[in-house]
Amino acid sequence: MNIHGFVDLHTHGIGKYDTRTDDYEEILTMARVHAKAGTIAILPTIYSGHINEMRKNLKAVSMAMDMQEKADNRKFGAQILGVNLEGPFLNPVRCGAMDRDTFIKPTLAALNKLIADYEDIVRIITIAPELPGALKVIEKCADMGIRVNMGHSDATLKQAVEAKKAGATGITHIFNAMRPFHHREPGIAGLGLTNSDLYIEVIADGIHLHPLTLELLFNHKPLDKIIIVSDSVRGQKTAKGVVYDKGVLAGSGLTISGAAKRLQLIGIRDAEIIEASIDNPLRYLGIK
């Protein structure tokens, strides 16, 4: 594929670096490594943590963005578009590799404490919509222009529909860390697969989602609502490009470029891959 570069809206880390830091230089290094792999823009994704820890991570990303704005972006690699918060308003039943002890009840006070002074850089937040108080937080985020993804959730279809009505616009790594699809209770996954308005994150490494599942998504979900993400993390990856934490899938070791190659192998057309990895993520953030 002859393209300018990919856009990754969900990356926790790459190589030896990740967002669990208070050092903006590490965030800039992440951006440089991503750029070498063909990614031109990223949304550093902060793990769920205690609010004071997440705020340190937010500050590091904010400072890295400031450094990019003051200098030639090419020096600092992939452009940092803002930040993606994966938590802390998540359901411990669907924690995946996240630290469930950091999950908290969604309240407007907790939201304000988390993002105060950083509202302008928070672009996406993942919330489990079935939690008490979640709908009010979703409504507030939507009013602020923050995209709300449903994820790390045990929500039923009815609860997911209510969240969409409240302002949720996307789904974090569909089928992963959520109630499994069932023929009598489709849950968030079922809504994401069939609804033409909701964007869905797709980890296309062939492990988080079976190749047949990837084909299903590309064949039945409106293409303009599919967003390829890496969900990349730092650390040693397996030969298949995934990272495990105590036997649980903890993230991908791939970049978007690597995911694109996996999609090509299962017959997804280049034009579809380009739309899902460049056009759609930018549109989701309102960037033309």
Please annotate each region the language model reported:
Residues 4, 33-43, 60, 91-119, ...:
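Active-site gating loops and adjacent loop-to-helix segments of metal-dependent hydrolytic enzymes
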Residues 11-14, 28-60, 78-91, 118-130, ...:
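Divalent metal-dependent hydrolysis catalytic cores, especially in the metallo-beta-lactamase
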Residues 13-25, 46, 97-104, 147-151:
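Active-site mouth loops of central-metabolism enzymes
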Residues 20, 112, 116-236:
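Active-site core of metal-dependent hydrolases
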Residues 21-24, 28, 48-51, 55, ...:
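Electropositive phosphate-/nucleotide-binding environments in soluble metabolic enzymes
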Residues 58-68, 75-86, 93-155:
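Metal-dependent enolase-superfamily TIM-barrel catalytic cores that perform enediolate-based chemistry
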Residues 191-200, 219-288:
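His/Asp/Glu-enriched, well-ordered alpha-helical/loop segment
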